[in-house]
Amino acid sequence: MEDERSTQSYQGGEAAEQVEVTDRGLLGNLLGKKKAEEDKEKEEELVTGMEKVSVEEPEVKKEEHEDGEKKETLFSKLHRSSSSSSSSSDEEEEEVIDDNGEVIKRKKKKGLKEKLQGKLPGHKDTEGEHVTGLPAPAAPASVQTHGGHHDTDVVVEKIDGDVKTEAAPAVPEEEKKGFLEKIKEKLPGGHKKPEDAAAVPVTHAAPAPVHAPVPAPEEVSSPDAKEKKGLLGKIMDKLPGYHKTGEEDKAAAATGEHKPSA
């Protein structure tokens, strides 16, 4: 009996332990699943981030590579066009007839002189004929000033690009005078010649007659004084406004005063 009880108790204890173990196992399984899911999510996030980085980097490199290829192609095209233009400018095609009568085109390199001539303005290359265009010679310019002044004309001649100035011969004075007279005739009031203007006398108002003062009679004490008096009398008679009567009265008064003093 005791053995049965011990076995039953032992079996009961084992069953209880198993129940506890199973209970703990369920909780552990639940917790373990949650942790595993979280770990998987973290791993997935890390993997996706790495994939994004790995995908984006090659795209940038590809774009840079494409830009470099485009630049290289443009540069190569420009280089080819410049080389082709230089080769075409440096070379000329010539038609040569063979012995069989066939026309063959051959390329001939241009010289430095021909290149320079081709770059000059006004140069035309037509079927091997080089024509250099020179400007036409300009007409001689005449310089004239109005208002009575006539300057000498300066003739300018342009020959083969070199400018030469030649002074015109001096104009004689007679021609200059004739030109001045023509201008004066065209002006209003200038029909009279300067000689006629100089010949016209200038009229001024006649000045008023000026009466000369009568000189005082001198005392006569000798025959020479009488002769002087006679000359003075003649001169006084010729003067305008002289009256003999007044002069004689003055002379008589002077002699009368002189006599008593003697």
Curated annotation (Swiss-Prot):
Expressed in roots, crown and leaves during cold acclimation. Residues 89-101 have a biased composition (Acidic residues). Induction: In freezing-tolerant gramineae, by cold temperatures. Water-stress induces the expression to a similar extent in all species tested, abscisic acid (ABA) to a much lesser extent. It comes from the Eukaryota. One of its GO terms (cellular component) is membrane. Residues 34-45, 53-74, 113-130, 187-196, 244-262 have a biased composition (Basic and acidic residues). It holds the Pfam family Dehydrin. Residues 106-245 are annotated as: 3 X 21 AA repeats, Lys-rich. Residues 1-153, 187-262 are annotated as: Disordered. Sequence repeats lie at residues 106-126, 173-193, 225-245. Keywords: Repeat. Residues 197-209 have a biased composition (Low complexity). InterPro entries: Dehydrin, Dehydrin_CS. One of its GO terms (biological process) is cold acclimation. This is Dehydrin COR410. It comes from Triticum aestivum. The lineage of its organism: Eukaryota, Viridiplantae, Streptophyta, Embryophyta, Tracheophyta. The gene is COR410.
